[in-house]
């Protein structure tokens, strides 16, 4: 969910808040996260390992919303515009859905770079920082920390 929010709303998070229910081993079995951006936009995220969830990403705007089905491996969007019938947009995988990652890795290797422009180290570290903030809020500490 964090990467999905970042792809849609960007990097300028102003405030991070959230709640989590931990297992007896200290794992966040379910959580709810709110990200408030400097632009005033907000992202509402959740994940859960104890319940079956629809795994949709929903992008809402003043004229309607878009549903990304199985957002982490999306092959279909449903576009819902106020006052109109919803319609689907397909974006099928060529093979497995990882083709774009393989192409980006090959391009970086051919250019003798250590990372891909599509997902830089800075972005990976930034998202890890958001996760660190949430884990600290929830009192999660791993044995190696």
Task: Provide a role label for each language-model segment.
Residues 84-88:
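Surface-exposed loop/edge segments in extracytoplasmic proteins
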Residues 1-2, 98-102, 124-127:
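A structural signal for well-ordered alpha-helical scaffolds and beta->alpha junctions
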Residues 38, 104-145:
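C-terminal helix-rich "cap/oligomerization" subdomain common to oxidoreductases
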Residues 39, 82-83:
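Solvent-exposed strand-loop boundary residues in beta-sheet-rich modules
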Residues 71-73, 80-82, 98:
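Active-site oxyanion/phosphate-handling segment shared across diverse enzymes
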Residues 26-27, 53, 99, 118, ...:
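Loop/helix-junction capping segments adjacent to catalytic residues or to phosphate/diphosphate-binding pockets
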Residues 2-75, 92, 103-111:
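Contiguous beta-strand/loop segments that form the cofactor/metal-binding neighborhood of enzyme cores
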Residues 91-103, 119:
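Active-site loop of classical SDR/Rossmann-like NAD(P)-dependent oxidoreductases
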